[in-house]
């Protein structure tokens, strides 16, 4: 069987790397004769990753509009726009989805879990339609979609997938309620199964009593109006330094040169100016970041797959949440997201994160014990999710 992954944003997004690495390993462990092709949006970025089970890779960024349209195509776009802007957009996006090599593979797996969570989803839908025209089976793996994101157009497109794997119950319940797809299942994100690169344990020391911290400039887009997530994060961490003897390790998890986490974290470290604050290099792989996170005493983070690295290694984790996925994952692990997720929309000063941090700190060891008991079966469930793929 020839499988193909698409909507992979590149390995400088180490959540994307973790999904591709684990999902490809799960396929190969069960069916080693299978071939897996990766359609990547950023081949240059993939050079920083570690994807041993990918047989072939091709850069194909269907999210970029075609640079040139023919006269006939322009006329068609103009005609469609008079009838419906949606129809015109769908046709325009479909022009970017043409690729002769798409005929070569049997099953296409969308590994971009957030594709239907933000915006109108027209680009993702256009690519799915193109694959369906070619008679291909399509799978939406590890998705998160809020009920508020489910437009009539999205539901129509979601119905055409041969399998949808929701990664948390809030998404599963929303899709079930909307009857978005009869082939809908619920399994943990495959990144919960990511292995740890033990070599980095020897080369990168994590001090005792270390708090791991991750934030990104992306979070600022969802924060309370008029607030600076960088300023609030800096003062919040200054409070921790002043009120405890904790060391603070700033851990990037998306390391793109222009807008990676390392930029905002580097500025925060410089502003704090403390010998107890350090920044993890932006050159690590997903497995290496997981190794670092696993040795922290606790973790506070915004990037979903950084928090998954912490959860899966039984590190007590307080999430800075900005979408349904953070609430859903916490709920599935602990039975509730209360006290475990700080909604970024409610952060307008340091008072909220400090208050939630202190509450979390008082229950930290309770959370650790729960993770130690809960995680083995949860990770095994994530591994077993691959059997759903072989049933379609």
Per-region residue spans from a language model:
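Active-site anion-handling motifs in enzyme catalytic cores
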Residues: 1-392
């Amino acid at each position: 069987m020839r499988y193909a992954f698409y909507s992979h944003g590149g390995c400088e997004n180490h959540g994307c790397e973790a999904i591709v690495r684990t999902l490809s390993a799960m396929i190969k462990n069960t069916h080693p004769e299978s071939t897996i092709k990766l359609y990547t949006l950023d081949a240059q970025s993939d050079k920083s990753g570690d994807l041993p089970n990918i047989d072939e890779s091709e850069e194909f960024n269907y999210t970029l509009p075609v640079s040139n349209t023919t006269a006939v195509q322009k006329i068609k776009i103009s005609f469609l726009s008079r009838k419906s802007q949606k129809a015109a957009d769908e046709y325009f996006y479909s022009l970017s989805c043409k690729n002769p090599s798409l005929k070569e593979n049997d099953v296409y797996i969308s590994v971009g879990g957030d594709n239907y969570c933000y915006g109108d989803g027209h680009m993702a839908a256009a690519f799915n339609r193109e694959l369906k025209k070619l008679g291909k089976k399509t799978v939406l793996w590890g998705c998160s979609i809020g009920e508020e994101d489910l437009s009539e157009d999205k539901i129509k497109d979601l119905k055409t997938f041969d399998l949808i794997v929701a990664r948390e119950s809030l998404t599963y319940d929303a899709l079930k309620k909307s009857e978005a797809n009869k082939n809908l299942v619920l399994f943990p994100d495959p990144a919960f199964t990511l292995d740890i690169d033990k070599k980095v344990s020897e080369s990168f020391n994590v001090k005792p009593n270390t708090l791991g911290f991750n934030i990104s400039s992306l979070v600022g887009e969802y924060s309370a109006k008029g607030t600076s997530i960088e300023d609030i994060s800096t003062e919040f961490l200054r409070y921790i330094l002043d009120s405890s003897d904790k060391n603070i390790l700033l851990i990037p998890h998306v390391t793109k040169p222009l807008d990676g986490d390392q930029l905002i974290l580097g500025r925060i470290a410089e502003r704090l100016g403390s010998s107890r604050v350090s920044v993890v290099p932006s050159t690590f792989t997903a497995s290496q970041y997981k190794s670092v996170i696993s040795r922290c005493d606790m973790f506070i983070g915004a990037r979903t797959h950084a928090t998954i690295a912490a959860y899966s290694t039984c590190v007590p984790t307080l999430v800075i949440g900005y979408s349904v996925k953070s609430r859903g994952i916490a709920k599935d692990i602990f039975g509730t997201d209360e006290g475990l997720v700080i909604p970024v929309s409610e952060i307008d000063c340091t008072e909220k994160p400090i208050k939630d941090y202190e509450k979390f700190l008082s229950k930290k060891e309770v959370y650790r014990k729960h993770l130690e008991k809960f995680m083995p079966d949860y990770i095994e469930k994530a591994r077993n999710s691959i059997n759903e793929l072989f049933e379609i």
